[in-house]
A protein has these predicted regions:
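Non-catalytic interaction/Regulatory regions outside core domains
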Residues: 1-130
Length: 130
């Protein structure tokens, strides 16, 4: 798969439409380099830019650790962290076949995270390539 042809904005648009309670969609590569990141219109970031970067780095590093365990426990499908003010979903962009990109999605606490995870998983890279 040629990742240079990925239309990250189109992926964002597809994901943000899934649920109005999605606050933020960030797509990064496996090293944590942000390929695309945008809040839903009208949503205020709760973290400073430095805190946002640190949170993403922690999520990426945690994902790398889980990937090391994959031969024994299987590949990670997603991670859900629920805080008092938001939920954070981290998952591979292209499902089990994509070890190169991570989705980092934040939602309102009331969001139906199971539905969001299921619907995001249904979005395939093939549909989103140029």
């Amino acid at each position: 798969m040629d990742y240079k042809k990925i239309d990250y904005e189109k992926i964002y648009e597809g994901i943000i439409k899934i649920d109005p309670k999605i606050r933020l969609v960030t797509i990064c590569d496996s090293s944590g380099r942000v390929m695309y990141s945008q809040h839903r219109e009208g949503i205020k970031n709760l973290l400073t830019p430095e805190e946002s970067k640190e949170s993403l780095e922690l999520a990426v590093n945690s994902w790398k650790i889980r990937t090391k365990l994959a031969p024994k426990i299987g590949k990670g499908k997603y991670v859900l962290a629920e805080y008092e003010k938001i939920k954070r979903i981290t998952m591979p962009l292209g499902g089990d076949d994509d070890d190169h990109h991570l989705l980092y999605i934040t939602t309102e606490v009331q969001a139906d995270h199971s539905n969001i995870i299921r619907r995001v998983s249904e979005i395939t890279i093939r549909k989103l390539l140029l």
